[in-house]
Structures are given as structure tokens and as C-alpha cells.
């Protein structure tokens, strides 16, 4: 039986996800109708990867001790990157309770999984098929998901959009760039391809105060220059005399 702390936390995360516009073209996630500890996600294959156009359904199974203990992460849809329905080893899964942080959430976990997915790092539950195979599986992913009654029951809106638009994405035909791992600590964990968003480069600006300081420094040097010139003139006079 789930604890009140766990249930309250997961309800807050569900509300936060529903209001998060930044992830609407990256993934969708919601709990099972009958069990709030069993969440289902769908990752939209990131652009510029072999997964682009894919539609990857999986589960996050939370322990009753959540958020103090990490969940199990699985992927059901064949991707060429993970073993289907097998627990995936990441720094934010139950394989590594020592690296888990209670501050991480569903959103953090899924973004971290996407980051790990776009790399070729090995681990328990991971495989690395050829790019051609992964592209082929991406094109077949919707057909596979439509045979899954759990997917069909939980994500009717995605199926409806797919049939109407002929696209895998719920809000637009062109998904936004995937967002950075800062979220993942391999993390947050991984530093990877998730975050290919434009990051402003810090620039150094000259303020009026800086300009005034430079002028003052320049003015302070003038007497020394005049004195130096005067000494040269005196020395020349004595030498020529």
C-alpha cells in the first residue's frame, strides 16, 4: 500500500506535468488508472537521432517509499536501445539508490532516460542496435503500440492526433529540441544530447563607471609624462652645453 507522502508527491507531480509547456513535444506521462505507483510515459523520438519519428511507451514503477527511494524504469516499445520490458540501469533508477535524490521527479527521470537513450553507453537493460535498425523500429513504433491495450487505453489523445495528422506528436508536427540533462546526473544525469537548447553566452559589458575610471587613470598619468619629457630636455641641454 502506498504511503500518504508518496501519493501526495505523485499527485503534485501529475499536476506539475499538466502545466509544463516545455515538455509537451518531448514526452507525456500519466499514472495507471488503477495504481498511482505505476506510471506510463511516451517519449517522442528526439530530432536528429535514429529515434526521430518514434513513439516509445514505457513504465516507471514507484516504490511506496518514494520520493526517498528510486523507481524502476522500463520501456515496452522496441527501440533498438533498450531490452523490452526489462529494468533499465540508470543513475536515477533502483539500480543506484546511492545516487538517488528525493528532489528528482517524474520529469527529471524521463528527461534523464531520453539523455541516456541518445547515447551509446551500455548497462543492464541496454542494447545498441545499428542506426538503420533503430530508424526502422522508430517507423514501426506506432503500429506496435496500437496492439498494446494499456497504451490504447491510457493515450487515446495521441492515437487520435496520429490518425488526424499522420504524425507521432501530440502538439505539433515538428517537435522542439530535446532538453539537456541537467536533469540527469549522469545526470541528471548525463550531460547529453537532450539539452541542445540555445544557451546565452555571457558577455562583458562596459558600464559608464568603467569608462570614467579609465579616463581618471589616463588623466593621472599626464603629470608623469610631462615630468619625463622635462627631464629629457634638461639632459639634452646639459649634454649639448
Curated annotation (Swiss-Prot):
GO MF annotation terms: ATP binding; ubiquitin conjugating enzyme activity
Subcellular localization(s) per the UniProt record: Endoplasmic reticulum membrane
CDD domains noted in UniProt: UBCc_UBE2J
Example GO biological process: ERAD pathway
Record's catalysed reaction(s): S-ubiquitinyl-[E1 ubiquitin-activating enzyme]-L-cysteine + [E2 ubiquitin-conjugating enzyme]-L-cysteine = [E1 ubiquitin-activating enzyme]-L-cysteine + S-ubiquitinyl-[E2 ubiquitin-conjugating enzyme]-L-cysteine
Bilayer-spanning residue ranges: 220-240
Function of the protein: Catalyzes the covalent attachment of ubiquitin to other proteins. Seems to function in the selective degradation of misfolded membrane proteins from the endoplasmic reticulum.
Name recorded for this polypeptide: Ubiquitin-conjugating enzyme E2 J2
Organism: Dictyostelium discoideum
Amino acid at each position: 500500500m502506498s504511503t500518504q507522502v508518496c501519493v501526495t508527491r505523485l499527485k503534485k507531480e501529475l499536476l506539475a506535468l499538466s502545466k509544463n509547456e516545455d515538455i509537451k513535444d518531448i514526452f507525456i506521462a500519466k499514472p495507471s488508472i488503477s495504481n498511482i505507483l505505476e506510471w506510463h510515459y511516451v517519449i517522442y523520438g528526439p530530432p536528429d537521432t535514429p529515434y526521430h519519428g518514434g513513439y516509445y511507451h514505457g513504465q516507471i514503477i514507484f516504490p511506496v517509499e518514494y520520493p526517498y527511494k528510486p523507481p524502476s524504469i522500463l520501456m515496452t516499445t522496441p527501440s533498438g536501445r533498450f531490452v523490452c520490458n526489462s529494468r533499465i540501469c540508470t543513475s536515477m533508477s533502483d539500480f543506484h539508490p546511492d545516487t538517488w535524490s528525493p528532489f528528482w521527479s517524474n520529469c527529471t527521470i524521463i528527461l534523464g532516460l531520453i539523455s541516456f537513450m541518445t547515447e551509446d553507453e551500455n548497462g543492464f537493460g541496454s542494447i545498441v542496435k545499428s542506426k538503420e535498425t533503430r530508424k526502422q523500429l522508430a517507423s514501426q513504433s506506432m503500429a506496435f503500440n496500437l496492439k498494446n491495450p494499456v497504451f490504447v487505453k491510457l493515450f487515446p489523445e495521441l492515437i487520435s492526433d496520429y490518425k488526424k495528422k499522420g504524425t507521432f506528436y501530440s502538439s505539433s508536427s515538428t517537435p522542439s529540441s530535446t532538453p539537456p540533462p541537467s536533469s540527469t546526473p549522469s545526470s541528471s544525469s548525463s550531460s547529453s544530447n537532450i539539452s541542445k537548447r540555445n544557451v546565452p553566452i555571457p558577455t562583458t559589458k562596459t558600464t559608464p563607471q568603467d569608462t570614467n575610471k579609465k579616463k581618471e587613470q589616463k588623466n593621472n598619468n599626464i603629470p608623469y609624462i610631462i615630468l619625463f619629457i622635462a627631464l629629457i630636455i634638461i639632459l639634452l641641454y646639459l649634454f649639448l652645453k
